[in-house]
């Protein structure tokens, strides 16, 4: 019986389900009259954390009986194959019912075969060939989840998630040299992020205040509620204080502080991205050889991390949220060193990052991918720079599962 299945999977459901799936389930259960409007509002409004909402939701459904539980299970199988895999649920190929793996003899894998990224091709701005994103085979995706499900950020099903990414690139400046090749960086990064399932917005040639406005608008997008992650790509000149706006000069301090970027996207200002990976890619020189420099995102390590009480981290007792968590910034070079950019081919860091993501995202977590990017720069070959991951607060491994 479906109610027995949900009772057995209750604890794992509470620990694994994402907010977007909870919202989808609530909408489905309201539409099918399993829950009424008051019950839905209680789940959403009277529970502070995602796990509290999940616990209230599944308990409400179980109390409604087997038919209500079956509707809930069917929705999970249809709209969140990742969660179905974690819970060992799958859709029966003959009956259309969603059964446990143990109950079904003929099942569809919880990770269906990925569609090629060329289903909706994006035409490059030039005739130059580009690489293609290697997709994650269903058996690899299932194995990774089976082995590491407790340590991996959950992904949401394609049919319900609304992933967003933002690229801000300053190419033209009033007082600084033009960043030739930046158009190639924009084109190729946009293609990559779209192939990974993100809807990408591009903003160009902004002042520091305009960049902050765009970031705040991006943080306020309602789509983040039903997303599982986000990417932010910043490409510009820089100085020690941060990222240069288009009007920067020694007399005009048109600078966006990197710390401001983190503040805009933190839990306090962007609660929709709470507990979800927020990846910040920054392409800029960090040394004086090119006349502009910017420093690392963090002035120094936090002095409070060792003072956090152990009970704050218990999965079923968390009532407070860390203001800054689940971030990673990947910078194009170490402090005091330049980042190289070809006027026709684009930035060396962006070129290598895209290539390695295309080749390894199907099997490697993001931090391992970033290590591979650093390794690709190990031999200087006359163009010395070393990309650096900073301000890392990821608590789990972030697998992109391209194609899923």
Curated annotation (Swiss-Prot):
Reaction equations catalysed: Strict requirement for an Asp residue at position P1 and has a preferred cleavage sequence of Tyr-Val-Ala-Asp-|-
Modified residues (Phosphoserine): 302
Alphabetically ordered keywords of this record: Apoptosis, Cell membrane, Cytoplasm, Hydrolase, Membrane, Phosphoprotein, Protease, Thiol protease, Ubl conjugation, Zymogen
GO aspect biological process, one term: protein autoprocessing
EC number(s) stated in the UniProt entry for this protein: 3.4.22.36
Residue ranges, annotated region (Disordered): 111-132
Localization (cell): Cytoplasm; Cell membrane
Matches recorded under InterPro entries: CARD, Caspase-like_dom_sf, Caspase_cys_AS, Caspase_his_AS, DEATH-like_dom_sf, Pept_C14, Pept_C14_caspase, Pept_C14_p10
Modification after translation (UniProt): The two subunits are derived from the precursor sequence by an autocatalytic mechanism.
Pro-sequence residue ranges: 1-119, 298-316
Active-site residues per Swiss-Prot or TrEMBL entry: 237, 285
Domain CARD per the UniProt entry, residue ranges: 1-91
GO cellular component, one term: plasma membrane
The protein's assembly and partners: Heterotetramer that consists of two anti-parallel arranged heterodimers, each one formed by a 20 kDa (Caspase-1 subunit p20) and a 10 kDa (Caspase-1 subunit p10) subunit. May be a component of the inflammasome, a protein complex which also includes PYCARD, CARD8 and NLRP2 and whose function would be the activation of pro-inflammatory caspases. Component of the AIM2 PANoptosome complex, a multiprotein complex that drives inflammatory cell death (PANoptosis). Both the p10 and p20 subunits interact with MEFV. Interacts with CARD17P/INCA and CARD18.
Functional note: Thiol protease involved in a variety of inflammatory processes by proteolytically cleaving other proteins, such as the precursors of the inflammatory cytokines interleukin-1 beta (IL1B) and interleukin 18 (IL18) as well as the pyroptosis inducer Gasdermin-D (GSDMD), into active mature peptides.
Entries under PANTHER family matching the protein: CASPASE RECRUITMENT DOMAIN-CONTAINING PROTEIN 18, CASPASE-1
Protein name: Caspase-1
Organism for this UniProt entry: Sus scrofa
Gene label: CASP1
